[in-house]
Amino acid sequence: MAEKHGNLSINSDNLFPIINKWLYSDHDIFYRELISNGCDAITKLKKLDMMGEYELPADYKPQIQVIVNPDEKTLKFIDNGLGMTADEVEEYINQIAFSGATDFIEKYKDKANDDQIIGHFGLGFYSAFMVADQVTIDTLSYKKNATPVHWACDGGTEFDMTDGTKEGVGTEITLYLNEDCLEFANEYRAREVIEKYCSFMPTPIFLSKANAETEYETIDAADKLDTDTVVEEIHEEAKTEEKENENGEKEVVEVSPAKEKLKIVKRPVPLNDTNPLWAKNPKDCTDEEYKEFYRKVFLDYKEPLFWIHLNMDYPFNLKGILYFPKINTEYDSIEGTIKLYNNQVFIADNIKEVIPEFLMLLKGVIDCPDLPLNVSRSALQNDGFVKKISEYITKKVADKLIGMCKTEKESYEKYWDDISPFIKFGCLKDTKFCDKMNDYILFKNLDDKYLTLPELLVKEEEKKDDAEVLDKDGNPIANTGDAAASDNTADGSDTSADSEKDERKVIYYVTDKVQQGQYIKLFKEQNMQAVILDHNIDTSFITQLEQRNEKYKFMRIDADVTESLKDETSAEDLKAETDALTEVFKKALNNDKLTVKVEKLKNENISSIITLSEEGRRMQDMMKMYAMNGMGGMDMNMFAADQTLTLNANNELVKYIFEHKDSENVPMFCEQLYDLAVLSNHPLSVDEMTKFVERSNKIMMLLAK
């Protein structure tokens, strides 16, 4: 071939600065592009062999070599794929590659950074000019009697193409790195980038350093391969020891036989796994393989709870593995990572257009060869095909969870505390997921038993008829069913006058078993139940459940004093106590807005209870959540929940205050009763606690006199 000097049909003053601007944050991506090109060339050559258009050598081993040379500031990418002729270099490098790069830049040069190309695919070979002042290609086509070609370009508008000297079929690309990118000639940096993008590419990738000292290893002679370079044969003598036999006589015993070993040049080890676990049939994978893959990919040495192996060929090709990690705190789940691959080539983490947002809480890999990559994120958002992928993934996750609940209930319950934030978040974010999961969400009750929502409602309905109710002395009394018949709660208890307006079943819940211990004790004495909802997400979750289903509502255990906790007494019977005690407590506490109720509770040991309206508390909780997420700025007191102080007319101390309301110590007793009630509901402030301790000391001094 005659030497050719030509001009590229593009203004490089426009192209390369834009490439650098576009890909600056991911300027290591050229590794992936060049190695991917090598993989494609090898795949095509193997297909030609399968079709009978080319015969591969018997000892052919597909591979890609990456050679770093820090001394010469170069980086080589060598593949033994199908190579190129001069005409193909002209077509694929001088015309198509540059043309494709030009179209790419022209289409997306005005896009904002948050609308970038998915994975930056499309630039291919010319991504090399992000880091190199000059790039050369040496290639030899598989075609019979092909002539090797040498091509060179310094990133300007000109290139040189001549006959080359390459002897083996394939392509060698050499990058002469610019001064700002010499890090990529470092062996450890190269390894890091290759493992980032190419850990699972389908062709073995080998990394080496030019002019490095030869490394050796020793193997058993029986393990020698034809490709091994033997440096030395080693004979190890048998090892013997002197031992006493059964007769007490000493004799020489062989403890290790003689061995023949070989010192060989260290065998190269590929950096990648060419057959990743997700590409295998799930039936052929063991639990240990799944766990090992998880540790390797996510560097997490805590075992995952369980996993879902996705394997679909129609109507689109998608494979992957999603892991449910073990969560140590309620915040751990936000650290999930879903890695997206295209034909085993890493694209990016957490592509929200493809992967449902709530799945980002998991860890996993998804490989979808059919995914369109040379489009912007905004295009993906509106792509019906991508939406189907997202819906399929969501469906498979729901199917797995439902299947576990039905057939592996014990395991499902064991995992529930870890996976419940994920499932609840998914229900909040995805209506279809919520519809499927609605009857398989578990609630843990005060006895640490897990029940689905339908089971919970049925169980509590049954308790209305069977409950053993206790009187104020703790003795069982007959349950005629009349009280239950008047109840509208899932626990067999009327909530308040509101129950006349709202016929929903009430599900009581607890957010802190320690803080709300007094209320729990009252419930258990009357054989009532509540569920535990102690995660930040639960307020939003139960609100959504109520909006979707009018059959039930949730109420925190301290939101009201239910009828089942009271003796049967009319409000008229307690009018005198209510009027007097309301006046005394409002005056003692200097709080005219305080709502005071007087009830006869069955447990006479409890003097007072603070209740907060459910609606007000939920608003408070939501405002706290906004503040935690940096969305504060509003006065939290604006959303203070309405408090009600309920005094127990059966309690001796309350009786004393009523009978001695003019006593000089009564205001102090009122303050103490109020603080005791508050303590059972939420912690006191520093100032409130200081006053509480001082007051307690005064009361003890009175008792000591």
Which ranges hold each PLM region?
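GHKL (Bergerat-fold) ATPase N-terminal catalytic module, capturing the glycine-rich phosphate-binding loop
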Residues: 1-185, 192, 199, 215-217, ...
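GHKL/Bergerat-fold ATPase module in large chromosome/replication-associated machines
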Residues: 117, 135-158, 178-181, 188-705
